[in-house]
Each structure stands twice: as C-alpha cells, then as structure tokens.
Amino acid sequence: MRHTLVRVRAQAWPALLAAHGGIGTLPFVRDWAARGWPLIVRRRSPCDAGVPLGLPLPPSAGKRRVALAAAREQIDSACALPTLADVGRQAPPAWRPTLARLRALADAHRVDCRVFGSLAWQTLTGLRYLSDESDLDVLLMPCGASSSASLFRFSSSFASSFASVSVSPSSPSVSIPQSSRAWPVPALAGASSSAAVTGAEASAPMTAQMEASASRLSRWPGSSSMPSRRDAIAPFLAALAEIDADAPMRIDGELLCADGAGVNWRELHAGGRAVAMKTATGVELVAPRTFLEAWR
C-alpha cells in the first residue's frame, strides 16, 4: 500500500535501473540498493508495469523524485515507516519538543504516528534532506490496527505482486511526501516519458464519487460499529492543530486506513462536507464520516 517501505534485492538493482533509461547516472541512485536504503510505494500510474516505487533524492542532488516499477522477484522485503521515537536523533533540536508533544497526544488517543518526508529519509539514509523550510510529515493510524500486519499489508491492487515478499509491520527500519505532486516517470525503452496520474483531475460528479466510495468503505469489517468516530477524533484533531500552531515547522500529513486510503488531517479538522481521499490509484471525494468509520 502507499507509504510502505520496500527493499529491492541488491543483485536485481542493475536490471531495474537498465529498464528505466539512464537514471543510474543520477547521484546516489546506482548504489542505493547496495547501501541498504529502501524505496517507497507510491500511487500507481497507467504506465506502471509492476509495483510502483519512488526514490526521493536529497536537495543536494536536485530533490528529484524518481519513479520506478519493480517486478515481484526484485523485491526483498517490506517494512513500516519510522515512528516519532525513531526519528528523534535526526530531528533539529527546535523540533524535538513538538515531537514529544505529538508522541504524548498520540499515546493518549491510541493513535500510531508514523513519519515520512524529509525527516524520515534523513533518518533512513544519513543524507541531508532537511532544510529550514521542511515540514514534519506524519501518518496517523489507529493503534488497534497498527499492532498487526493488517495495517501495513499491501492493498488489494498490489497483493498479487507481493505474494512472496516478507512484510515487517513493526520493523524499526526507518519517506517522501505523498502529496498531489506526481512522481516523474523515467523514460522506458521505446517509450516516451509521462507523468504519474495524481487523480486530482477526476471529473465524476462529487455525489457519484462519494456514493461509490461510501459503498466501498462500508464493506470494511466492523465499519458500522462506530458511528460517532468523527466526534471521537475531533478532540485529537483540535489538539493536533494547537501543536501545529505552536510548532517551529508546519505539521502536514494524513489519517491513513489499513488499505492505504488517506485524508489530510487539516481537511478533516476543517469540518467540510467532503474531503479528498487518496487511494492507491487516485483521489476520491468522500464524506468525512464515511472515511472515519473505516479509519479504525
């Protein structure tokens, strides 16, 4: 699912690069797998023939976001994003009180807070990703779901591609912001480059999208047992907004369901009638209550 870290087999890396044009000449790319650094599952685009992966280069290498697609046999393992505790040492000193407040808030509300973006990649690689303009990017998931492999399992669209891949939901291994910006897709042999589809251009009427999404999410096991989930999460989002207002950096991120569907926390906190829900393949408009009933 989106935001899952995967490691490509080192011996498969040359073939993977060869299938994606001349990207092996970019800084850090050729030795990425040999260094044990992971890639991240990104949103699928129409031209992907395999598991869609992203490789974010640091600012010193142009901050380019390289899109790859790996075959099942090229994947070695998968693991979760880092926790707030994992990234503490790499965080700027000015950020650390905010991280502590976030950790306390998450614990109090039984929310599993994972980190992606610049801070996570700096922790993962040791390369410098953070700048004075960096945000803190977080994923917010219910603790009950994150305690098992189900939270970090790949969504059904990727399941067949990972039939033989080991998954480590609690791995301490420690990401790139999965915003509406697309990952550029390197040119393939005999094909021209194209951009990944973000789904922001979806043209279906809002009501039709919301009804379709409601139907899909209503099939989530036990989704009808917590009709007041929006009310329950409101105090958490309000406290998160207070921490964000006091923080030296912007706190960005999503509430994430176990199937990889996610909604920006600011949209949910704003209390609008519809929110943009990112999925493995695009963006859907849904009612906040519909999303939150599945977020558990």
Where are the regions a protein language model picked out?
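Short, solvent-exposed loop/turn segments at secondary-structure junctions
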Residues: 60, 120-121, 258-260
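Broad gene-expression machinery/nucleic-acid interaction feature
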Residues: 50-52, 133, 137, 250-252
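Conserved catalytic core of two-metal-ion nucleotidyltransferases
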Residues: 227, 231-277
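Active-site nucleotide-donor binding segment shared across nucleotidyl transfer reactions
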Residues: 101-136, 140-151
